[in-house]
Curated annotation (Swiss-Prot):
Gene Ontology terms, MF aspect: double-stranded DNA binding
Swiss-Prot/TrEMBL site (Cleavage) positions: 15-16
Listed name of the protein: Protein SspF
Protein family (similarity comment): Belongs to the alpha/beta-type SASP family.
Biological process according to GO: DNA topological change; sporulation resulting in formation of a cellular spore
Length: 59
């Protein structure tokens, strides 16, 4: 089975990790090294950004 292509680009994920304060872990251990809580916070923030962009488009 092939892996599903990620929805978020690596650049966007790195920006979110920097914003949320765990980019150092990503650099040292890769994405597998982050805590589940950090991954959840990253997804939550990505959703917030997407919602803001949709609201701007609909105005």
């Amino acid at each position: 089975m092939s892996r599903r292509r990620g929805v978020m680009s690596n650049q966007f994920k790195e920006e979110l990790a920097k914003e949320l304060g765990f980019y150092d872990v990503v650099q040292k251990e890769g994405w597998g090294g982050i805590r589940a809580k950090d991954a959840g916070n990253m997804v939550k923030r990505a959703i917030e950004i997407a919602e803001q962009q949709l609201m701007k488009r609909n105005q």
